[in-house]
Amino acid sequence: MTNKLRSEETITSLSSFMASTLSIASPSPCSIPLSVTKVSPLKRKRPTHLNIPDLNPQQPISTDYFRFREGDAKVSPLKRKRPAHLNIPDLNPQQPIRTDYFSFTDFAHQNGTVSFGGNGFGVVSRNGKKKFMEDTHRIVPCLVGNSKKSFFGVYDGHGGAKAAEFVAENLHKYVVEMMENCKGKEEKVEAFKAAFLRTDRDFLEKGVVSGACCVTAVIQDQEMIVSNLGDCRAVLCRAGVAEALTDDHKPGRDDEKERIESQGGYVDNHQGAWRVQGILAVSRSIGDAHLKKWVVAEPETRVLELEQDMEFLVLASDGLWDVVSNQEAVYTVLHVLAQRKTPKESEEENLVQGFVNMSPSSKLRRASLVKSPRCAKSQSYYYNSENESPSLNREIGSSPSKSPITPWKSLWAKAACKELANLAAKRGSMDDITVVIIDLNHYKG
């Protein structure tokens, strides 16, 4: 009994001791001091003190890692540093740069116009109202190394310049290839046909939707071969009278309309112009894949013997022929040539005689290192055909025997080309204008 009482007292004492201990270790919430600030678990507590080393101001700081040192010129990271020395090869100034052909892109042009002249020809090409130039041309004054054998071509692009550029790059090569060993007139006509069709086929394989009208002339062995597609035209001056050597391929032409309709197509008059399928205003061209069933690439070709009364040939795009008649063109050229007795020295600088310096300047520098005879200086001027005098027709329509066009006057073929191009522009031509004039006297004899 006594032991049981002792055990109960012991348990009671232990319970009292534990209760007092818990009351000390776990104070009530009301006993927490109000001055304690809670710290967010997302923020790091700023240290109360930063140990910043005391740097000696007399101790220099190493700058080995800096990009530029004292005395170096700073270079912008956006610009490349120019090398200290350029090795430019010493070219022999007496060595001519040979070119087998001339084209629109070979010569720098200013204000949308390019012009140059050579021994027996002149060229002018100027941009119309469109944003991009679509005319091209190709001149090979010494075909197969023969100065009396030349190729001339004017190409008028539509739907872009791709077709005209392709023709200018390739047609003359195919003509030379196809004409090899050709003798009779019929063989030459077939050779030109094959060259045009091959050019068309090769361009169509590129899958480009574009087209080009063409007029070409090859002069060789006292004969002239003229071919055309579309509305580019060749006009001959024979004893002061204009003679068209080509017929424009227009959908309104009876034979062309019949051919198109026989192939299941149709010709429609849209705003005063006849058009194939109501779209294209020419019935033959290179390219125009979407109309190829009706717009063929077979040219019409003529072979003529050079005769004494043949004075010059004008090849031009429709930018000229739409506003200037054949006879007006001949009159204008004759008048320009008649007014210039001898060429000025400055004009002689623009001659091209088979060699050319590809200058980027707006003025073509002396192109040939071969000396040509200089002519005496004289006064000269350009004729404005819009202010034509009543006596002009009698003067320029006179017999060639009274005022012959001698070979040296071909120096002014370029001036005559400029006059024709300016005349067309003044009359409101909206299209690109390209004019090539060939002095046929250069190829006679």
Curated annotation (Swiss-Prot):
Residues 120-440 form the PPM-type phosphatase domain. Its EC number is 3.1.3.16. Keywords: Hydrolase, Magnesium, Manganese, Metal-binding, Protein phosphatase. The keyword Metal-binding applies. Residues 384-404 are annotated as: Disordered. It is an enzyme of class 3 (hydrolase). SMART domains: PP2Cc. It catalyses: O-phospho-L-seryl-[protein] + H2O = L-seryl-[protein] + phosphate; O-phospho-L-threonyl-[protein] + H2O = L-threonyl-[protein] + phosphate. Its cofactor is Mg(2+); Mn(2+). It comes from the Eukaryota. Mn(2+) 1 binds at D156, G157. Mn(2+) 2 binds at D156, D318, D431. Residues 390-404 have a biased composition (Polar residues). Coiled coil: none annotated. GO terms for molecular function: metal ion binding; protein serine/threonine phosphatase activity. Binds 2 magnesium or manganese ions per subunit. Belongs to the PP2C family. This is Probable protein phosphatase 2C 14.
